[in-house]
């Protein structure tokens, strides 16, 4: 199954954080916080302004983005846990 986001929504896959600290302590899954970074997998066409003109999104497929820990709606697709969220829920694009 493929998802095609509508309007100003994006599909994001969380990027898992390290499960071992710098000192070598292993953090169990249930104690680890949800990561707040992800990779954009798909973007919608954008949203319309007051004049009816389509405004494209600022993010693109492949961008690494920052978002709130509880942002978006979680969906499972082909065994992967993905997030569907509005572009407004994104805080920043991580530049390489």
UniProtKB/Swiss-Prot annotation:
Q: Gene encoding it?
A: groES
Q: Which GO terms describe its cellular component?
A: cytoplasm
State one molecular function term (GO): protein-folding chaperone binding
User: Entry's PROSITE patterns?
Assistant: CHAPERONINS_CPN10 (PS00681)
Can the keyword Chaperone be found in this entry's annotation?
A: yes
Name by which UniProt lists this protein: Co-chaperonin GroES
What is the role of the protein in this entry?
A: Together with the chaperonin GroEL, plays an essential role in assisting protein folding. The GroEL-GroES system forms a nano-cage that allows encapsulation of the non-native substrate proteins and provides a physical environment optimized to promote and accelerate protein folding. GroES binds to the apical surface of the GroEL ring, thereby capping the opening of the GroEL channel.
| Binding partners and assembly | Heptamer of 7 subunits arranged in a ring. Interacts with the chaperonin GroEL.
Which biological process annotations from GO are given for this protein?
chaperone cofactor-dependent protein refolding
Q: Which UniProt keywords apply?
A: Chaperone, Cytoplasm
Q: Where in the cell is it found?
A: Cytoplasm
Lineage runs:
Bacteria, Pseudomonadati, Pseudomonadota, Betaproteobacteria, Burkholderiales
SUPFAM superfamilies documented for this protein: GroES-like
Q: Could you tell me which InterPro entries the record lists for this protein?
A: Chaperonin_GroES (IPR020818), Chaperonin_GroES_sf (IPR037124), Chaprnonin_Cpn10_CS (IPR018369), GroES-like_sf (IPR011032)
Cystines in this chain: none
Protein family per UniProt: Belongs to the GroES chaperonin family.
């Amino acid at each position: 199954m493929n998802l095609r986001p509508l309007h100003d929504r994006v599909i994001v896959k969380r990027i898992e954080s390290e499960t071992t600290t710098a000192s070598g302590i292993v953090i169990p899954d249930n104690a680890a916080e949800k990561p707040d970074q992800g990779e954009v997998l798909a973007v919608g066409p954008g949203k319309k302004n007051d004049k009816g003109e389509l405004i494209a999104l600022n993010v693109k497929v492949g961008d690494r983005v920052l978002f709130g820990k509880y942002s978006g709606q979680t969906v499972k697709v082909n065994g992967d846990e993905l997030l569907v969220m509005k572009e407004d829920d994104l805080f920043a694009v991580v530049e390489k």
